[in-house]
Structure formats: C-alpha cells, structure tokens
Amino acid sequence: MTRQDIIDRLKDYFSHDDDIEMVLLYGSVAKGTFNPKSDIDIALYSKKELSFEVLAKIQTELAIMFDREIDVADLKKAEGTFLYQIMTNAVKIKFEENIYVRYAMKALYFYEDFLPILRRTQEEKLKRMLNG
C-alpha cells in the first residue's frame, strides 16, 4: 500500500463523520519513510469530547482496514514536543483552517520558548564530550 493509498482511504473514512473537524496524519507515513511494519499515526480534533470508546472504535476500525497498528491522538490533549511533532510534518486529511492555525501557533510558541533551553543543553553536552 502506498502513502497516497493510505491518505485516500483515511479521507474516505473520515469524510462521513461531521463531529470530527480535523484529521492530521503524522509520523513515518506522513514523512514518506514508512515500511510494511510501520504504524499509522493520526491526530483528531472533534467538536465533541473524544471518549476512550470513540478513540478505541476508530483505532480498531482503521487497524482492520489497514492491517497494521494505528495510533490515534486527541489533538486537544497534545502538548509540547508531541504537538510540535504532529504539526511540523502533518498531512491534512480533513482540514479546518482556524483550528489548524491555532494548534500550529501553539506548537510554534512552545518551540520558541523551548529552543534556548535545548540549545543550552546541547552546548553543555558538547562541552562535556570535548572535555572528556
């Protein structure tokens, strides 16, 4: 199954669900680096709360459809590096611009706040490596 096959089947699956406003494909399939054993990672945004039962139903149906493991994340609960990971390589399966922009900005603000800390940590590690 190709990357485009996965995208097309996800679009078809979610096209009939009006409660789910946005679906983002991320991870190795989104990047095009997947293999036959790779899982499929999707993040959902819903008008209604995504209960465990709803997420489990979607996960199970998609696992059967694709015959591979499916990871389903609730975008409302995604934060920090996880949200940044989703938003930086997302393929838009079902798209709502206002919602997308809100979460992209949230991820960007996190990255901008976290970047100085990350750089300082990397510099300290490099100094330790160079100094033995």
Give the predicted meaning of each segment.
Residues 1-22, 30-32, 47-132:
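Catalytic core of pol beta-like nucleotidyltransferases
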Residues 43-45:
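Short hydrophobic/aromatic beta-strand micro-patches
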